[in-house]
Every structure is written in structure tokens, then in C-alpha cells.
Amino acid sequence: MLSSILPVDSFSVVALIATFLLVSLGLHFSFGLLNIVNLVHGEFILIGAYTAFQIQDWYGSSLLGMLLAPVVAALCGAFAELILIRRLYMRPLDTLLVTFGLSLVIRQGIQLIYTANPKQVVDPIAKSIMFVGFNVPLWRLVIVVIAIALVVLWLVINQTALGIRWRAVVANPELAEAMGINSNHVRTSLFAAGCGIAGLAGALLAPINTLSPQFGLRFLINSFLVVILGKPGSIKGMLVASCVLGGSLGVLQFHISTVYAQMIVLLLAIIATRLRPLLKKA
């Protein structure tokens, strides 16, 4: 059997790469495109996860909760952009402070409502298949497919009139305004889209993780690592960074503890970030 030949569960590595891609795609909109140091990104992942849990609690359907999670997160994101962030573009230190404060408010609010006790979102499929000798939960396969679909969807939208308007505002807001594009509306839609994707990521990842008010923090650092290493604003760079970081972490976890594996991945990301300018000069 291939499981006796392969040193690691190859599909688990692929699933981890998809997880890195999924949680960082929302940050690609706010940090990569809008240049917002978005420390509340993890809490929008949290909002999506708890939306799925709450809908499951009310109606007994985690799948319905997953469908509504990105809508709720996007609406919360649009509200946050309108009230707090809109006046802080081009002021990165101020956005850092505001998003950090908002993350604390959301996290503590969720803890007050749901307590710190762990919650669980039910796997809507709860089945598995054999893949090269390994038992693969079908829900992880769903996560991989959705992550790929979101990237393809973004690449397609990027070539439409809507995508051109978005890129125009990101590149030169003043010129875009002169051409009749409402930059405020575009920024709100971009930020809301990023929050919606973060909420979807949280809802999709909730069934394979224990849910708590600290849930979003698990993904915040890795999201920033992927976007920064892949070059902010570059979807292709983000794909490569997800493969490198997620793949490295997935392989290392089979040989050493997760804590040490994460430390090594962080060190690799720092080294790669430092070497990139030198490689460009060469």
C-alpha cells in the first residue's frame, strides 16, 4: 500500500495548504489590496464560525449556518468599514490600533455571550474515503475544493468591469474618482468581501476544530505570513506562499510537535522575507 511508502498523509498536507489559502484570502482584500493592517481579521473568522454554531443551535443545520456565515461576516465588515476604517486609509498605525481594539471587543463580546467553554459545529457530511491508504474525511476534501473555487472566482472577477474598478481604486484612488468611480463604495465592497470570505473560512473550519473565543487567533499569524511572503496584492504569490508554508507545516507536523513545526515555519518565512530583496537585486 502507498501508505507504507509515503512518509506523511499527503492529503492532510494538501488540506493544510487549502486551509492556509482559505484563511489568507480574506486578508488579501483588506491588507493586500487596501493596505489596512487588519488585526481584526481573525475575529471575522470567529464571527463566521459562531454564526454557523448559532444557526445550528437554532435550526439544527450546520450547513445552513455555513451558508449564512459569510453574509453575516460581510455585513459586519461593511459596518466596521463605514464607521471606523473609512477615515483611516493611508494611516497604517491608526488602522492597526483601531482593528486591534475592535478585535478585543468582538472576542470579549463573544466570550460574554457564549462563555469560554468549547463548542462544536457538526460535520455536515461526517463521512470519509480511502485515499492512497489514508482515511480522508470528506469535509476536508470540500474545504480544498472551495478554496480552489474561491481563487478561480477571484481571478475571473478580476478580469470583469467590477474587477477593473476595484483595481483602479487600489492603484490610484484620486484618478479613479476623476473617472467617475466611487472609491468609498469600492473600498467598502472590498473590505466586506474580505470579511465575508473570512467568515466563510471560519464556518468551514469549525467542524474540524474546537470552537472557542480564541478560535480566530489560531489563523491570524499564518494569514499575515502568507500575504506578506506572497507579496501583498498578488494572488499568485499568495498561492505559492500557501503551498510553501502550509506544505512545510504539514510535513513537519508528522515528524515533530505542532509547536516546533510552527516555529520552524515562522523562521522560514522570516528568512524568505529577508532574502527576497537580495534575490531581486541579484
Residue spans of the language-model regions?
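Transmembrane helix-bundle core of multi-pass membrane transporters
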Residues: 83, 87-159, 186-189, 256
